[in-house]
């Protein structure tokens, strides 16, 4: 029996795979629990169209991320914070302050996709990575100065 999986199933296949299973396993378990549907010609055609649309959508998202990466490429930030007499920062500079500095420049970036490698606790130059897509990321230099 040929079926189309609706979710990942261990030792059988991944979502949207067309697999052959024994009739009893398909009819009595996979189809009633909603984990699969029968791979009829119309279902195969719908699956192909769905995969085509999904690929097109993912390609558009990647292009948008690459366009934003090109805009962010030349950006460098200056973040002013309160500093002690020894040059250490009260607290630290995190992705929240970097997102706010980018917002002031007109780039609304979610703070969750900004990664700062090391803890920023002193005045100086650092780099943050903005992960716009799983294949597209931008390194943004920023300088921490005394307020």
From Swiss-Prot:
The keyword Transport does not apply. Keywords: Ribonucleoprotein, Ribosomal protein, RNA-binding, rRNA-binding. It comes from the Bacteria. One of its GO terms (cellular component) is cytosolic large ribosomal subunit. PROSITE patterns: RIBOSOMAL_L9 (PS00651). GO terms for molecular function: rRNA binding; structural constituent of ribosome. This is Large ribosomal subunit protein bL9. Belongs to the bacterial ribosomal protein bL9 family. One of its GO terms (biological process) is translation. Binds to the 23S rRNA. It comes from Bacteroides thetaiotaomicron (strain ATCC 29148 / DSM 2079 / JCM 5827 / CCUG 10774 / NCTC 10582 / VPI-5482 / E50).
